[in-house]
Design a protein with these regions (language model features):
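Mitochondrial intermembrane space
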Residues: 2-6, 10-11, 18-170
Length: 170
């Protein structure tokens, strides 16, 4: 029995080595497409796993810095009506201080030598996507940006018209 298992393992390694030789040997790193998974829109730290297990810690730390930046720099309003007048209906959240601010909905995460995450907010005009504080827009229909499943669900929910009353915050 042990010999059979050993033989299967050896066969798998041999097959993997054989396949490793397949492909275009002339492809250089400059020719290779960049992985779209190293930059993308995610909705939570749990989405960091979409960048690969080795990137989870860097991704989560970048998100934590983005949340801190959002909390420190977001304009606050004394009531929800003033907030919604400034940023739009159903696009506000209540801060720990009791004041209202624009709802933090997702993050644009870029991993590399200096991992970073940018806070993202609901897109304008019912578009399925998000926008940054500098008004850069990331739409789900844009093929150059990867959305996690959760981020796509959040974008779709925020873009769909509400049906009676306020939609709950995420």
């Amino acid at each position: 029995m042990r010999t059979l298992v050993f033989a299967r393992v050896i066969a798998l390694f041999g097959f993997a080595a054989l396949l490793g030789g397949c492909g275009n040997a002339n492809t250089t790193s400059a020719d290779a497409p960049q992985s779209p998974a190293m930059r993308g829109v995610i909705a939570s730290a749990s989405d960091c796993v979409s960048f690969g297990q080795e990137a989870v810690t860097a991704c989560a730390a970048a998100i934590e810095r983005a949340v801190t930046r959002h909390e420190a720099s977001s304009q606050t309003y004394s009531n929800i009506e003033a907030c919604e007048k400034a940023v739009g209906a159903n696009k506000c959240e209540r801060a720990a201080s009791g004041k209202y601010r624009q709802k933090l909905s997702a993050f644009m995460v870029s991993l590399g030598s200096s991992p970073r995450a940018e806070p993202l907010y609901p897109a304008k005009d019912g578009a399925v996507g998000f926008q940054s504080s500098d008004k850069s827009t990331y739409l789900a229909s844009d093929q150059s940006v990867t959305f996690s499943r959760l981020a796509l669900s959040v974008a779709e929910m925020q873009a769909s018209p509400k049906k009676g009353g306020r939609r709950p915050s995420l």
